[in-house]
Amino acid sequence: MRRTKEDAAKTRAHILDIALRLFGELGYSGASLSKIASAAKVTKGAIYWHFESKVDLYEQLIYEKSRQSFNELHGILSGPGRAADRLQQYLIRSFLLLAEDQSFRELQRVIIFKTEQLPELDAQIEQQKNSLRLLLDHLTEVIEEGKLDKSLKDNVQSADLAWEMLAFHNGVSNTWLLFPDSFPLEVKAEQIVKRFFESVVNHQN
């Protein structure tokens, strides 16, 4: 029984890996379950054993491939140290993950550039929006902490800076994904983040 469970887990992980590749190559609409099954060298029934539908496979793919990175980044924001340092490390680490973690990078490409606006994905898109709202709330809270611990300037508008951080992150990430050879993100990540925070960090503290 133990071996069967291990084999099933390996098959499920393999299907997710193949699905990530095909979604990246063909887009969500173009990567049918039949094509995924053929590329994974499993039956279509095997896919349905692990996933209820193509939508379920897509949702599980996003969850499985982003969970570790999400937990790491959340831990940085919630961890010890000055708030300004945590905010900067959050952005730096998110850029490094994008540049250095191939699976994370390919997932972002699929979500941003290869997923069409389809009715069947409305629930997933709404979930992504809710996740962004929660992130904005968390960033705003940490920025407020920064004003209290004097690592950020008193006149910083917390909600505005949270939005600006998100826009900065998405702008850099999306542009780099389109032109990865034009900018050494893994080398420049700290530099561009420090520059972004230059006007809001309290250098006197």
Write out the residue ranges for each language-model feature:
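Hydrophobic alpha-helical segments that form the core
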Residues: D154-T175, K188-F196
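Base-recognition residues in the alpha-helical recognition helix of bacterial helix-turn-helix
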Residues: G24, Y48-E52, Q60, E64
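Hydrophobic alpha-helical bundle segments that form small-molecule/ligand-binding pockets
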Residues: D122, L132-L161, V200-N205
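Key DNA-contact positions within bacterial/archaeal DNA-binding proteins
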Residues: G45
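Hydrophobic alpha-helical connector segments
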Residues: Q60, E64, H74-F104, S158-M165, ...
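Short secondary-structure transition hinges
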Residues: L96-E141
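Basic, helix-initiating cap at the start of DNA-binding domains
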Residues: M1-L26, G30-V42, D56
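Amphipathic, non-transmembrane alpha-helical scaffold segments
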Residues: L16, Y58, I62, S66, ...
